[in-house]
Amino acid sequence: MAFGNEAFPIVLLCSLWYAISSSNNVIGKKILLDFPYPVTVAMVHLLSTALYLSPTLHVWNIPRMHSIPKSTFVKLILPLSFGKAFSSIASHVSIWKVPVSYAHTVKATMPVFTVILSRFVLGESQTKEVYCSLIPVVGGVMVATATEVSFDMIGLLSALMATFTFAIQNIYTKKAMRDLRLNHLRLLQLMAIVGSAMLLPFWALCDLRRIIIVIQSGEQEMLWLLVILTINGFLNFAQNIVAFTVLSIVTPLSYSVAASMKRILVITVSVVLLRNPVGVVNVLGMLVAIFGVFLYNKAKYEANRRKHELPIVTKHPPMENNIKNNHIHYHLV
């Protein structure tokens, strides 16, 4: 009975996570098909994150942020915020140009970029199992790309750029939380605020005039568009919060399984509802890539577990553990 009581909230949260993520991706694609302004959609997502996190952090009683030195802000926060804005734009361009199913398959290459960047930026080497897990990831994405009916080079490059930027953010977010001793949600809020401010002039230059022309022409039902953009922004925020909550009550390995299942469901729902054409080999490539991501997460989990079993004494283990957990949260979402 106790097991049932513990399992019920996990199943409920995972179901909610899957439903929100699938809905958000389908709605996002629909918006970009009718309203092809990915910079505007990215701006809405950043503003929504900044806006909705304020009451959330207050309710959860997350400690307030202390003052950040100007040099640290310039060297760390500004690049991270720029990366968040850029990756959001690139991600939405990819969703606009290619099917959701294919964009999500390309984003499965995140472990490849993470391993390469960790090696050259941090000097970290991985276990043989981790390197081997990258083979199905790369192979699956290559098969999916070769057989993608609605292939678009801009969409592919945008998805790769978004994934590459996410990988860089994962590495430097760890450094930011270690150096600044910030809660990961406080850092996320700060990045969203600064990223919105950085994106504002580019948005005004790129989209504002064209949107005004569309409004004046009466081509779009603006009230409905504002409503659907607001819903999309809230769903994006809710998706991240639910994902953080799931990881806080399950092991990283269990989370990786849940995340892999979520990606499969998002791809399936998008194929069914958006009716983008896929072939058997194309689907096989997607599944192989997702399975490779699961193998990567499992290999990393085992490597970290073995590392923690070694008799290493550190001066501040609680803080280091906290930072590590925060990094895992950010990386997996």
Question: Each predicted region: which residue ranges?
Answer:
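Polytopic endomembrane small-metabolite transporters, centered on the Drug/Metabolite Transporter
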Residues: 1-333
